[in-house]
Amino acid sequence: EVQIRHLSQPDFLQQVFADQQPQPGLLPLRGELRERVTKVLGHPYRGMRLRYWHSDEISAWIIDEKSKDMPMTVGVAVGPTGIVDLEILVYREPRGGEVHQAFFRRQYRGMTLSENDTLSGQVDGITGATLSVDATSRVAAMALVLHQVVMDRLPSR
């Protein structure tokens, strides 16, 4: 089994939150939210809840999603203006690993949710990595949905 670790969870959270101490949270995936996530991914999400971290306006999510045969682990940070950071933490396929490169990941910055919970922008694919690109885009859209739900539930400051 191929497993390439690009970034650890603590390093990803440090990159997103710098000197702030993010609050950890656990979001149950049920009811309408579970239906939205299933629609975004094109299949039901395996877990019943998702761990996340948040500060005042930013949430960070670490999500596993199947690429071709194996799951990849993606970290997505979302703020008031959309996606602020996207990292491939662990990649487990023999091909398509180019999705971890900065030129590809930068395309997601600033993307928000359009109607129907799709990404607001187009992503240029990578030849030979179509399934990994699609999986990354599904995770990005899922993180935007989850961020919206969490921010709506936080008490107003």
Explain the meaning of each model-derived region.
Residues 1-134, 138-157:
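Flexible, solvent-exposed loop/hinge segments and secondary-structure transition points
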